[in-house]
A protein has these predicted regions:
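Hydrophobic ligand-binding cavity/cleft-lining segments
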Residues: 1-43, 138, 150
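Generic structural detector for well-ordered beta-strands
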Residues: 7-11, 66, 91, 108
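Beta-strand elements of well-folded, non-transmembrane domains
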Residues: 10-12, 57-61, 107-111
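Short, solvent-exposed helix-to-loop capping segments enriched in aromatics
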Residues: 19-33, 48-59, 127
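Glycine-rich portal/gate segments that line the openings of hydrophobic small-molecule binding cavities
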Residues: 38-87, 96-100, 134-150
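Beta-strand/loop substructures that line and gate deep hydrophobic ligand-binding cavities in soluble
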Residues: 78-134
Length: 150
């Protein structure tokens, strides 16, 4: 499995962060490339719950995320899209000024045939890491707004 990740310090506690992260109605404000929700099961955000969403035209296409873990320090989903499949995890540990957060994606490419490794090394991993960083930056803005309102 390949891996891309981003880190930040955010002003909310881990439970507050996971509540915000799993609120699909808020995703347009922070998830990179999110255009619209197509489907959401009643069990979301519990394990087995699923959301299907569509990206902007220049994005990932149709994305399906199924919750695989919702523990005290992490929220993980199995991610399926045209170009890859993998596990996305938001981890949060308490810190003096909120939480230390890591957003990671462990993935396998489903395209590029025998050139997968080269494509990943030269283009894909960096693009994914940059997208995770942008998502985490926008999530930080949402977390700061959430803190201000509480």
């Amino acid at each position: 499995m390949r891996r891309a990740s981003a880190r930040a310090t955010l002003p909310l506690t881990p439970p507050e962060l996971f509540r915000l992260w799993s609120d699909v109605e808020r995703w347009p404000s922070f998830v990179e490339g999110f255009a619209r929700r197509l489907e959401l099961t009643e069990t979301w955000p519990e394990p087995g719950g699923r959301v299907v969403w569509e990206s902007t035209p220049d994005g990932r296409g149709r994305v399906t995320e199924t919750v695989t873990e919702r523990a005290g320090d992490r929220f993980s989903t199995q991610v399926y899209e045209e170009a890859l499949a993998g596990t996305q995890t938001l981890r949060a540990l308490p810190a003096s000024d909120g939480s230390e957060v890591e957003l990671s994606l462990e993935y396998e490419l489903s395209r590029y045939g025998p050139l997968r490794g080269i494509a990943d090394m030269l283009f894909i991993r960096r693009a994914l890491r940059d997208a995770l960083r942008r998502t985490l930056r926008r999530f930080e803005v949402e977390a700061e707004e959430e803190e201000r309102l509480t």
